Amino acid sequence: SCFASLLTPQGKFLYEFMVVKHKSGYLIDCEKTQVDGLFKQLSIYKLRSKVEILDLSNEFVVAVLSRNKFLSLKNTQDIEGNTIKFREDTLFLDPRNKKLGARLVINLEKLYLSIKKLNLKPAEPKKYYSLSHKLGIPQIECKHLKDKIFGIECNFEELNGIDFKKGCYVGQENTARIKLKNKLSKRLFPINIIKGELKEGEIIYHNENEIGKVLIEKDYPFALIKYRDKNFIKNTDFNT
């Protein structure tokens, strides 16, 4: 299983998702709010290819297991993307960061039985999303990144989402140029609110110097930060 994305011809972010082998085809695991847009985008790329693209979001769900639970099962390896079959369904260690645990992509009708077989206990989703935020991996409201940020600025290289040895793909020219010429000066970072509120698009300052912009404001906020700017200092407070 792998982490992947769709970019604009300019290399800007469109959609991110995980690709999982399932029987004679593949399943795409993405944020629920992005299903319709991603489905339409993939249908455009289909052209005359003998490929059938289906929206199965009402039939399949994703359950998240801890990394330790995954490694307690037979034939597992502590490697991002490591994939096994569990009762005919796909179970894989998150390809972005193994600290996020494993994902079970399963038909909704079989979910309860699999939870019972795995002896899983329910956990607060907030704990999972808080961990993801801490690790710098946005999973909610990613639509606010669309066309606003380069894929490489989303830390896709660190999240195993870019292969610089791969052949041509949409958005490759700018992505490769930024990488090879060491032009990456901004990155997506998680931010924590000390006081007040954030709004999408707000400029972030340090000592009256602009160093970034808020892109995701709700629940688990993220900002595009000029991390190479001389005014950017780690472990300090900023204001908007």
Predicted regions and their residues:
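Residue-level recognition of well-ordered beta-strand positions that form the cores
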Residues: M18, D29, V105, G167, ...
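Acidic, proline/glycine-enriched N-terminal capping motif
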Residues: S1-E16, V20-K23
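Acidic, low-complexity central loop/insert segments
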Residues: M18-L135, Y205-H206
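Glycine-rich, small/acidic residue-mixed loop/short-helix segments
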Residues: F13, I152-I162, Q172, A176-T240
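A generic beta-sheet turn/junction motif
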Residues: Q10, K21-K23, K46, L184, ...
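Glycine-centered loop/turn motifs
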Residues: S1, Q77-I84, E197-E202, N235-T236
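Anionic-ligand-binding alpha/beta catalytic cores of soluble enzymes and soluble regulatory domains
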Residues: L100-L188
